């Protein structure tokens, strides 16, 4: 697809890519994505009279590298190529538009649970308006500490949890009838309340 959108563009060498990445630091990325996020919220307000929250899906991936110049590359928990160092890339994506609203690059040995609060705190520190945003994560980000911090910050969130936790399993069993009742289902979001 690159030749369709950028017909005159030539692929960059790995050396040139490393040089370009060396001048982009996280604070530049934070400022850039703050502007993107603000633009998206303004566009949402113009289109929707209702105060519908933004759903911001957060997820991370590890990228393996042979590079010796990437400072944040570290040995992590790679399933593929465990002999290579890796870098974590976390993205915040607007559910409705698919726009990337935030990106965070971190050391490859950091797991999602540790990363979650760092990402949220960076967004808060850079004045991201999260007042009408629901943060959505998978179970890899779940910990009681993370949940309590989000509650303390008065942030809205949906977080996957492993059913292996006895307390969660008991709650599912206790409320099974209500969860299966169509009256408690939001058809638009396809979730049970």
Enumerate the language-model features and the residues they cover:
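Conserved, well-structured functional cores that handle cations and Mg-NTP chemistry
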Residues: 1-193
């Amino acid at each position: 697809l690159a030749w369709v959108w950028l017909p005159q563009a030539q692929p960059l060498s790995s050396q040139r890519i490393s040089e370009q990445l060396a001048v982009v630091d996280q604070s530049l990325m934070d400022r850039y994505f703050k502007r993107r996020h603000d633009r998206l919220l303004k566009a949402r307000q113009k289109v929707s009279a209702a105060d519908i929250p933004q759903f911001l899906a957060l997820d991370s991936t590890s990228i393996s590298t042979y590079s010796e110049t990437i400072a944040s590359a570290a040995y992590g928990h790679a399933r593929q190529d465990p002999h290579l160092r890796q870098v974590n890339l976390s993205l915040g994506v607007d559910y409705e538009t698919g726009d990337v609203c935030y990106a965070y690059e971190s050391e490859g040995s950091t797991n999602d649970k540790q990363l979650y609060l760092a990402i949220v705190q960076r967004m808060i520190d850079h004045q991201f308006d999260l007042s009408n945003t629901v943060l959505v994560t998978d179970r890899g980000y779940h910990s009681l500490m993370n949940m309590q911090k989000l509650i303390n910050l008065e942030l809205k969130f949906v977080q996957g949890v492993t059913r292996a936790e006895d307390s969660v399993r008991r709650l599912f069993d206790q409320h099974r009838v209500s969860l299966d009742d169509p009256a408690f289902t939001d058809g638009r979001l396809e979730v049970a309340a």
